[in-house]
Amino acid sequence: VSGVNRMDAMFKDASEFEGIGLQNWDVSNVTRMSTMFANATNFNGDISNWDVSSVTTMYSMFKEADAFNQDLSSWDVSNVTNIQWIFCNADSFNGDISTWDVSNVTSMYRVFSSASSFNQDISSWDVSNVTDMSVMFPQAVSFNQDISSWDVSNVTNMGYMFYGASSFNQDISSWDVSNVI
């Protein structure tokens, strides 16, 4: 697959697909992975070694991939600009993505919405370019990490950001929310 540059919706709705044999795919030229595994409810393939450094959009990539919980810690996502919905309803995902460079992302809309198992340290994420954090953690019932150091000064929308995030109990009083409408 080394010549492929778009993998949008490749396994979308493939509910029985488990992802066996994907670990050695050369995806280094792929720029789009939107909805790639969306609704692939049994997908839990090892894609930890994928070179995703050319990818610019991961919109809804693992949305409702209920079984997915693989190591993505080594992924270089520095060119990604769109991660909206990426882990929405990914019920099992609780991977370490603390080192992800999300500095080019401007919207965190529904990134962890209903990601019921996710509770990882993302305090070092550079979110200074983000303007939309609406519906980012709703129903993320396990999430309770200290994100007080985030620079949210450019965010204009935080609607429903922690709606139903029943475990979240962190002090975010230092956030500059002066631009939130």
Where are the regions a protein language model picked out?
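Negatively charged
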Residues: 1-181
